[in-house]
C-alpha cells in the first residue's frame, strides 16, 4: 500500500506548514502562453436564473441527489451561492462549473417530471455553461473544488444518450485528485478535520464512479486501490446522507457505494487485469461471490432473486442494478465457454460449479429486468444510465434460450426481453442517432434467433416460423415484412459495432460469429 507520493517536492510539502503569501497548489498551474489565454475567458452560454430560481434548484439538488452524490458540503455551497448573487461573487472556474452542473442536474429532474422538452433544453444550457469552464479547470486549476466540479459535470453526462464525456471527465477527476494528493492520507497539520473528511469523501466519489463505469465497459480503472488507499469517511452520518427504504429502513447510500466499489476493484484485479492469477479462476470467482453476498446481507438483505422489490430512491435502484451486474461479471468469468463457444457441452454435462455460475448469471439477469420494470417511464436519465446493464441481461437470457430452448423459463424470459426492447425503442425514438440504435440491432437479432430456436424445438417447419419481436409489433407492416425476409442478410461485425457506441459489448463479450450467422 502506498504511503504517499514519492517525489521530493511532496516530502517537503507534507512537512512544511503552509504560510500566507506562499505559492499554493492553485498558483503553480496558472501559467499559460498568451496565445491560448482567450480559451480561458469566461463564456456564458445561458444566463443564470434569478436568485429565487437558483436557490430553488440548488435546494432540490441537495434534497434529491445529495444522498447518492454527496460531493458538496451543503452549507458551504449555499454560502457560495449567496456570494454569486452579491457583490462578493467569486471568479473561480471550479465554482462556475460546479454551480452550473448542479443547476443542470436539478433542472433535468424537473424536466423529466414535467415531460417538457423546453425544460430539458434549459438543463442542457446550464450544462453548456459548465462545459465551457472545464478547459480552465483541466489546465490551470488544481484544487479540491476542481475535482468536485469535474465529478459534478460527469454525473450529469452519465444519464445522457452520450455517456462518453462522463468516462473522460471521471478519469480527469481521478488524475486531478492524484495531483493534489487526496488519494493518500494527508500528513499536513494545517488541514482541519472537516476538510480532511471532505477530501476523503470527494476521493471516494471519484473511485465509486471510476470503478462502476469501468466494470460496465471492460476498461481498466484509473486508480488501483492497492496502490493508494484512503480510509472511507465512516464518521459522515449526517441526516442529509441517509436514505429511507420503502420499508422504513435507514441506509447510508454513500457507504454502501464505497463498499461495492472496493469489491468492483477486486473484480477487475482478480479476473481481468494482468495481475489476475491464470490457474485459479474458480477460487477467485468463489471469493468474489462471497464478498458480494456479504455486501448484500449488510446493505440489501431483502434483495434476493425470489423476493418482491418495490421502487426505491433512484440511488438505491442504481445500487441494486450495479450489484446484480457485478454478480454477472463475476459468474460469467467461470462459465465463459458456455456463453460464447460454438462447441459448448450440454448444460447437464457441465461441472456443478459451472452450472451454478450459469444460474447466477440467469437469476441476476432476471432480477435486473424485473427491477427495470419498476422504474417510472419519466426517469429517462436513469434509463440511459443503465443501458449497458440491461443489454447484458438481454444477451444472457437470449443466449440461454438459444442454447436450451426447451427450458421451462425460456418463454417468460423472452417476454421480459421484449419489455426491455420496448424501453430501448422508446428511448431511441425520443432522441435518435445514438449508440442505442446499434444496441437495438444486436438485441433484436438475438431475440429473433431465440424465438426461432424455441419454435423450432417444437418441430415447426423453418418456413412457417414468425420471428418478429412482439416488442416491435406496433411498427409498420413494411418494417415487419423487412424483418421477416431480410434477417438472413443481416451481418454483424462486433468490431464495427464497438466503434459506433461509447460502450463496448457489455462485460467484454467476445461473441463468436456462430451467434450472428443467419438461421432463417
UniProtKB/Swiss-Prot annotation:
Protein localization: Nucleus
Annotated Gene Ontology cellular component terms: nucleus
Pfam families in UniProt: Fungal_trans
Residue ranges of the region described as Disordered: 1-30
CDD domains: fungal_TF_MHR
Keywords of the record: Nucleus
One GO MF term attached to the UniProt entry: zinc ion binding
InterPro entries documented for this protein: AtrR-like, Transcription_factor_dom_fun
Chief location of this protein within or outside the cell: nucleus
Top-level division of the source organism's lineage: Eukaryota
GO biological process assignments: DNA-templated transcription
Purpose of the protein: Transcription factor that regulates the expression of the gene cluster that mediates the biosynthesis of fusaridione A.
This protein's name: Fusaridione A cluster transcription factor fsdR
Organism this protein belongs to: Fusarium heterosporum
Amino acid at each position: 500500500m502506498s504511503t504517499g507520493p514519492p517525489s521530493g517536492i511532496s516530502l517537503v510539502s507534507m512537512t512544511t506548514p503552509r504560510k500566507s503569501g506562499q505559492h499554493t497548489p492553485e498558483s503553480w498551474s496558472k501559467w499559460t502562453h498568451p496565445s491560448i489565454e482567450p480559451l480561458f475567458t469566461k463564456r456564458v452560454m445561458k444566463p443564470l436564473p434569478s436568485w429565487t430560481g437558483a436557490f430553488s434548484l440548488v435546494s432540490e439538488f441537495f434534497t434529491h441527489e445529495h444522498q447518492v452524490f454527496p460531493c458538496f458540503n451543503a452549507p458551504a455551497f449555499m454560502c457560495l451561492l449567496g456570494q454569486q448573487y452579491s457583490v462578493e461573487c467569486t471568479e473561480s472556474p471550479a465554482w462556475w462549473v460546479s454551480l452550473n452542473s448542479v443547476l443542470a442536474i436539478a433542472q433535468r429532474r424537473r424536466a423529466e417530471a414535467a415531460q417538457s422538452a423546453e425544460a430539458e433544453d434549459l438543463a442542457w444550457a446550464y450544462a453548456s455553461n459548465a462545459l465551457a469552464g472545464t478547459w480552465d479547470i483541466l489546465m490551470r486549476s488544481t484544487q479540491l473544488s476542481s475535482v468536485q466540479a469535474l465529478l459534478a459535470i460527469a454525473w450529469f453526462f452519465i444519464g445522457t444518450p452520450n455517456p462518453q464525456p462522463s468516462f473522460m471527465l471521471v478519469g480527469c477527476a481521478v488524475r486531478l485528485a492524484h495531483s493534489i494528493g487526496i488519494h493518500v492520507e494527508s500528513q499536513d497539520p494545517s488541514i482541519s478535520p472537516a476538510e480532511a473528511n471532505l477530501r476523503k469523501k470527494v476521493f471516494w466519489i471519484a473511485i465509486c464512479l471510476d470503478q462502476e463505469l469501468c466494470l460496465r465497459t471492460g476498461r481498466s480503472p484509473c486508480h488501483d486501490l492497492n496502490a493508494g488507499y484512503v480510509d472511507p469517511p465512516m464518521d459522515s452520518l449526517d441526516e442529509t446522507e441517509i436514505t429511507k427504504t420503502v420499508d422504513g429502513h435507514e441506509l447510508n447510500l454513500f457507504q454502501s457505494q464505497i463498499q461495492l466499489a472496493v469489491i468492483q476493484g477486486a473484480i477487475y484485479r482478480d479476473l481481468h487485469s494482468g495481475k489476475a492469477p491464470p490457474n485459479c479462476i474458480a477460487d477467485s470467482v468463489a471469493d468474489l461471490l462471497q464478498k458480494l453476498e456479504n455486501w448484500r446481507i449488510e446493505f440489501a438483505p431483502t434483495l434476493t432473486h425470489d423476493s418482491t422489490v418495490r421502487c426505491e430512491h433512484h440511488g438505491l435502484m442504481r445500487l441494486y442494478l450495479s450489484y446484480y451486474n457485478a454478480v454477472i461479471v463475476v459468474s460469467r468469468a467461470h462459465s465463459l465457454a458456455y456463453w460464447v463457444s460454438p462447441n459448448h457441452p450440454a448444460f447437464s454435462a457441465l461441472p456443478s460449479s459451472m452450472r451454478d455460475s450459469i444460474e447466477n448469471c440467469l437469476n441476476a439477469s432476471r432480477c435486473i429486468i424485473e427491477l427495470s420494470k419498476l422504474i417510472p417511464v419519466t426517469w429517462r436519465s436513469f434509463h440511459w444510465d443503465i443501458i449497458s446493464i440491461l443489454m447484458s441481461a438481454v444477451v444472457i437470457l437470449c443466449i440461454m434460450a438459444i442454447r436450451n430452448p426447451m427450458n421451462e423459463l425460456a418463454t417468460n424470459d423472452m417476454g421480459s426481453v421484449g419489455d426491455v426492447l420496448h424501453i430501448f425503442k422508446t428511448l431511441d425514438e425520443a432522441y435518435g442517432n445514438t449508440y442505442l440504435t446499434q444496441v437495438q440491432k444486436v438485441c433484436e437479432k438475438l431475440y429473433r434467433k431465440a424465438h426461432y430456436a424455441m419454435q423450432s424445438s417444437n418441430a415447426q417447419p423453418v418456413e412457417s416460423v414468425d420471428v418478429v419481436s412482439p416488442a416491435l409489433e406496433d411498427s409498420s407492416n413494411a418494417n415487419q415484412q423487412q424483418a421477416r425476409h431480410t434477417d438472413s442478410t443481416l451481418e454483424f461485425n462486433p468490431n464495427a459495432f464497438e466503434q459506433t457506441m461509447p460502450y463496448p459489448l457489455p462485460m467484454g463479450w467476445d461473441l463468436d460469429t456462430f451467434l450472428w450467422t443467419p438461421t432463417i
